[in-house]
Amino acid sequence: MEILKETFPKMTRLAYLWNPLAVSYSAGTTSGNPSYDEAKKITKTLGVQLLPYRVLSLAEIEKAFVDMPKVRPQALLVLQSPLMTLNSKRIVELALEKHLPGIYPSNQFAQQGGLIAYGPVIADLYRRAATYVDKILKGAEPANLPIEQPTKFELVINLNTAKQIGLTLPPNVLARADKVIK
């Protein structure tokens, strides 16, 4: 969200597309969704209104994009989930149809035309998974292996998309990018 705010400093409304089946729920949160609660806290600090769209299927994703113009979001944030990954191409198409700049959870979205992607380096996750498999094959008990979080993240910017929707990205945002698609 901070990248979006840096890219669009006048942004006041952010559409937030999420799938509740893919998030870990916590009894200690207001909504039961720690990711949503954190997003709400950050957007409030940034002076941005969070417009959540809870989706469980492609049909609900498409309906969310039909409904979005009613509240006029200035940007889109897509939360990582298998549903979003499976429908990444369609989500990007819908955002482009609405001229809605978005930040997406993985490089895959930027490769398909999404404006900005920020997320873990997928190849690194596979390498780390292989070390787990190796340990298990050598006799380690899976229950005794620590849970690891991603450590390598990448920022990918699609300049073709920026041009298509008529955006000029600030030089400081471009300078932070690990990869720029031209």
Model-based region annotation:
Residues 1-182:
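Short hydrophobic alpha-helices and adjacent helix-cap/hinge residues
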